Design a protein with these regions (language model features):
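Cofactor-/ligand-binding subdomain signature composed of acidic, glycine-rich
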Residues: 1-41
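Gly-rich Lys/Arg/Thr-decorated short loops/hinges at beta-loop-alpha junctions or inter-strand turns
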Residues: 30-38, 98-109, 221, 262
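Short, basic, glycine/proline-bearing loop/turn elements
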Residues: 34-44, 110, 135-138
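A short, well-structured juxtamembrane/interface segment
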Residues: 44-59
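Glycine-rich phosphate-binding loops that contact phosphosugars or nucleotide phosphates
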Residues: 67-204, 213-215
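EF-Ts-like protein-protein interaction surfaces
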Residues: 192-206, 229-242
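Short, amphipathic alpha-helical interaction segments embedded in low-complexity terminal/linker regions
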Residues: 213-298
């Protein structure tokens, strides 16, 4: 049983012991100085993040899913990352999804006791009909949350890839996962408030994981968001810029190609660069598994 009082996330931060007596600007600078430590902590675990990306990518290539699971702030960060994948990369909402202890309502208010139930973590994943091609990322700043441990154990039992994202190196969750990502951002400015530095570190890591996987899946061309879903005027204008940047085409030509493809950037780019029609561009992209660079190379 983990002694919660000894967790790194529960320690007092000597630098902020008198934060309640500071002028506002000094308070803000103190918080900012502590936040500066987060990027360095994440940098130290880049090899583990890369390993997670490669493992998740391999399974998604086989049709598997990326599933985040967590409680409270950690769970909400998973929901946020999963929710951004469909509009950013046109992924099927079922391919990247999140499960939070306590369900939908826990996004907006605490659900008492949900995080302390191991069986709930397992049962929430059972409802998704998990397979060995799936990847489960358990997010828990303390690395000892029963809900997350139960989820990781169930995922392992069906052969899914398991990844633990914590902020306590050497924590319990590391023994329950195939890959452990445990940066050490240090004690929080407000003791135990893991929505702060720990949450920032977790957000950075989830950004890296989802971005890295999507890049490897061919969802970008260069650094351009060529699979963006043009669901509003801002994003339609972004599509125009993307196509112009990728092809060097004039505004009118880019817009014409996008109108023909219903604002799908990938075929529009191939059409303009290779001089083929929409059907030809789509055929080339299908042969290239949706990768623009490969489609252009023939």
């Amino acid at each position: 049983m983990t002694d919660i009082g000894k967790l790194a996330t529960e320690q007092r931060n000597a630098a902020s012991e008198h934060i309640d007596r500071l002028p506002t600007l000094d308070m803000v600078r103190l918080i900012n100085n502590e936040d500066k430590k987060v990027a360095g902590a994440v940098e130290a675990v880049c090899p583990q993040i890369a390993g997670a990306i490669d493992g998740i990518y391999a399974r998604m290539q086989r049709g598997g899913r990326l599933i985040y699971t967590g409680c409270g702030t950690s769970g909400r960060l998973g929901v946020l990352d999963a929710a951004e994948c469909p509009p950013t990369y046109s992924t099927d909402p079922e391919r990247v999804r999140a499960v939070i202890a306590g369900g939908y309502g826990a996004m907006f208010a605490a659900v008492e006791g949900a995080e302390d139930d191991r069986s709930l973590g397992a049962n929430d994943l059972k409802a998704l009909h998990l397979t060995e091609d799936d990847s489960v990322v358990g997010i828990a700043a303390s690395g000892r949350t029963p809900y997350v441990l139960g989820a990781l154990d169930y995922a392992k039992s069906v052969g899914a890839l398991t990844v633990a994202v914590t902020c306590c190196p050497g924590c319990e969750a590391e023994a329950h996962a195939d890959i452990a990502i445990s940066p050490a951002p240090g004690p929080e400015v407000i003791t135990g408030s893991t929505r702060m530095k720990s949450g920032t570190a977790q957000k950075m890591i989830l950004n890296m994981i989802s971005t890295g996987v999507m890049v490897k899946l061919g969802k970008v061309y260069g650094n351009l968001m060529v699979d963006v879903k043009a669901s509003n005027e801002k994003l339609r204008e972004r599509c125009v810029r993307i196509v112009r940047q990728a092809t060097g085409a004039e505004d009118a030509a880019a817009r014409a190609a996008l109108i023909e493809t219903n604002y799908a950037c990938k075929p529009a780019i191939v059409m303009l660069l290779l001089g083929v029609d929409k059907t030809g561009a789509e055929t080339l992209l299908t042969r290239a598994n949706g990768r623009v660079a490969a489609a252009l190379e023939g």
